[in-house]
Amino acid sequence: MKKHLLILSLVFLAFASCKKDEAPFDASAQAAKDETAIQAYLSAHADINATKDANGVYYQVITEGNGAAATATSTVTVNYIGKLLDGTQFDTGTGLAVKLSDNIIKGWKLGLLHAKTGGRILLIVPSALAYGNKASGLKIPANAVLVFTIDILGIS
């Protein structure tokens, strides 16, 4: 019996050691892929006139809003829809209060700084400013560029 367990263990070890290592993640190559995908998305959606900010977030202020502007320490109350570039909706929220200094994706922390109370903003977030090379749940794959339409209900 011990002999069979030893042989079985050795066979298992042999197969486990044959597993190939994953290629190292190349952030600059992924950034280039994201940029190409975003440009294709913008070309296919002529109604979107987004600006790329210094941090790499694309944004379009759809409705300016007339209230206070967000700051890095603001709490922003929003309604939002999140989609992948292919249009697949992965999330939606109403009346969500988000503190920009908390643990949220960088794309929101940076992109919502372009928003004011009462406004609507479109954010196109490269993967590095979203979930990076890790999937999030079942609906957001690794290296996904995310598109958000966000209504700003209040800023405090």
Map each language-model feature to its residues.
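Cross-family detector of peptidyl-prolyl cis-trans isomerase
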Residues: 2-8, 18-156
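C-terminal motif of bacterial Sec signal peptides marking the signal peptidase cleavage site
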Residues: 13-17
